[in-house]
Amino acid sequence: MSFSPPNKSADATIQITEMTRQGTPSSGEAAASTPSTSSTESGDKALEALGYTPVFKREFSRWSSFSFAMSISGVYGTLMSTWIYGLQAGGAAAIMWSWIIGGAGGWALAYSIAEIASAYPSSGAMYFTLKFLAPEEQVPFLCWIAGYLNLVGTVAGGASTEYAASQMLLAAVSITSNFSYVPTPTHVVGVMIGLTTIHAMINTLPTAWLNRLTSGYVVFHISVLLGACVTLLVQKRHDMHDLKYAFTNFQPSSGWSPPGFAFLFGCLTPAWIMTGCDGTARIAEEAKNPQMVVPRAIANATTFTYVIGFFFNLVLVVCMGDPKDLINSPSGQPVAQLFFNGMGRAPAIFFTLCGFGVMNLVAIPGIQAGSRTIFALSRDNLLPFSHIWVRISKRSQTPLIAVWTYAVLEIIINLLGLASSTAIGAVFNVCTVALNVSYVIPIICKMVYGRMQKGPWHMGKYSVWVNAFAVAWNTFMAVIFFFPTRLPVTPENMNYAIVVFFFVLIFALVFWYTHGRHYYTGPLTHSPRATDMSVRTPVGV
């Protein structure tokens, strides 16, 4: 396999004088002043204005970018994987209200990310934007911390997706055996290793193949979700619940006081599902007209996920019967058990396998987005041995070494599953906390320093309110997700997310003070600040 060497031209950035910022023209002015160019040229010009030389082929269109964003959330499969958290937090009412409130926080965060991604379309995503949003003297340190948190959150997110997909496949096997087979942690980890390897192999294909793979995802996803809901509702079981039960029946069992506090733990479900919304921003260098296509994909996919997730939750709650039967399911998958109770064996196997299929289609673009994170951080010399991870394959024009590195990291972190279900639960929590903190840092900088130049997609006068809610809610939830979900605390139910998170944070700080501050100056672009912003308004979108 032959590789092209990393771009070394960025090494001279420190010697280049900062260029004068120019005001951002309105969309109409920019459209009038910008010559008619292809969507690829528009994206490349935007990237060059940010200081990077394009190295990826732009294969992702408006539709495939939206489909990619939908696949990152994968609400059918991801909700099946995390529904247990709301169920244990308080049953029906906890599930519904945690989705409504927690989902609103995720929606605000996604829109805040979309707005910033429109202004700075780069594979570095939110980490990279700090170069433009923070004061110059603070950029190196803030980028360093945000970059490492984003990386560990991304790896934890990919790892938890692979683990959840493995659980779902084995749940289908358990149902097939009439529950005589009970999945063990060893079995789940073994399947996870196989799935991760397959998904990494798929990511060695050229971007055009990945574009085709994700393009049909939305149709499949919606069809499966609607099919499952209709099949459940037409059964007319005697133990179906009404809407009052769905929104008012609260069964606390966590030991927390007041009991209503426990419902916050159910917010992990919408947080985990929506928290990877910047994954689409990481393919900005592979998308056509990324200044509009990427933020639209993020915003539309998140809104769709929020709305359709509400109705899917409602159907599951109405049809769930006795919650204790689901929590104690031998398959280890409450929603799979719900399907079995409500539909029968054959349909339950089918829809559980569909969930497994959806999770595969979440994991594949997850590796793509994660490998681009490693590439972007390495391009800026943030990671050890960056010159290795940044290499691009001449055959596929993708960062193959970064792909396999990311896959290996997923496997390593999932080995925690061999310890206990509590330990693997920490992976889900770390994903949400680390990613959300890495997102909140640039949003706070945007609000405090007022340096952001608007891209063509923005929220106008509502921006500050949406940003403020996103920061407040997700900062609050980052603290909540460190709490143990049950009292009294024992070694078995301890939430080890706080241990993992602060281990990474302390490592990043120590590495910064011993090494990073001596050479890392922030994203290595051709110029310290953006130059001609007029290229940000795309043509033909």
Curated annotation (Swiss-Prot):
UniProt feature, compositional bias: Low complexity: 23-41
Q: Name one GO molecular function term.
A: gamma-aminobutyric acid transmembrane transporter activity
Q: Where is this region: Disordered?
A: 1-43
Please give the superkingdom of this protein's source. Answer: Eukaryota
Q: Where in the cell is it found?
A: Membrane
Q: Which UniProt keywords apply?
A: Amino-acid transport, Membrane, Transmembrane, Transmembrane helix, Transport
Please give the start and end residues of each transmembrane region. Answer: 66-86, 90-110, 139-159, 188-208, 214-234, 255-275, 301-321, 347-367, 399-419, 424-444, 464-484, 496-516
Q: Which Gene3D superfamilies match?
A: Amino acid/polyamine transporter I
Pfam name, any one: AA_permease_2
The biased composition feature labelled Polar residues covers 1-22
Presence of keyword Cell membrane? no
Topology with respect to the bilayer: Multi-pass membrane protein
A single GO CC term, please? membrane
Q: Which biological processes are named by the entry's GO terms?
A: gamma-aminobutyric acid transport
Q: What family, per the record?
A: Belongs to the amino acid-polyamine-organocation (APC) superfamily.
Stated name of the protein: Amino-acid permease 2
State the taxonomy lineage. Answer: Eukaryota, Fungi, Dikarya, Ascomycota, Pezizomycotina
Gene that this sequence comes from? aap-2
